[in-house]
Amino acid sequence: GVDGMTVDEFLDYLRAHAVEIVDTVKAGKYKPQPVRRVMIPKEEKGKFRPLGIPTAVDRVIQQAIAQKLSDEYEPVFSLHSHGFRPCRSCRTAIDEALDIANQGYVWVVDLDLSKFFDTVNHSKLLQLLSDKLKDGRVVSLIHKILRAPIQEGDKITPCEIGTPQGGPVSPVLANIMLNELDHELERR
């Protein structure tokens, strides 16, 4: 992240500031730092995937939120959703596809939501979260995480759309956003 903190430095920092961090989060006063933009080359020549790398403290907070969200949402996620889920993987998706094919189904729908993480609508996502989560402080903190500025070199830009790939909370937020689509596809 933009803090440049190593794991050892972070452990020392955490020992000295853990109570303060927890109190700030509980009070609703925590403000995430900018995420560091890193461009990762895609397989297609000349194409890049933007990652947003949070600071060490922000990463730990995001991981805690991701665990809470996973506990809340896992029971309502589609049984046929395999991405970014506990005990699920490409292997389990392939196994399920083989089972379905062996049942005689011959049609496949292949969806690729181009630049999905980069285009997540904050308002829609926050509404979905507000509908399910009882603690408004969690929704407010997620809103702050989504709005954390992006730092690329010396340039800092506001974030008004998307959830940066690279943070621990982004995959579960993506699954929450896509859950309605998953269930709609099941009905068809």
Regions found by a protein language model. Name each.
Residues 46-51, 74-77, 108:
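Short small-residue beta-strand/loop micro-motif enriched in glycine and branched aliphatics
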Residues 1, 51-59, 119, 171:
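Ordered, soluble secondary-structure elements with a strong preference for glycine-centered loop motifs
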Residues 32-54, 58-59:
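Conserved beta-strand/loop block within the catalytic cores
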Residues 41-47, 69, 154-158:
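Residues forming anionic-ligand binding surfaces in small-molecule and nucleic-acid pockets
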Residues 2-6, 67-80:
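Charged boundary/loop elements
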Residues 2-27:
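Surface-exposed loop/turn segments and immediately adjacent short secondary-structure elements
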Residues 17, 24-34, 38-39, 76-80, ...:
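Conserved polymerase palm-domain catalytic core
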Residues 51-69, 75:
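Hydrophobic alpha-helical hairpins/lids featuring a short glycine-rich hinge
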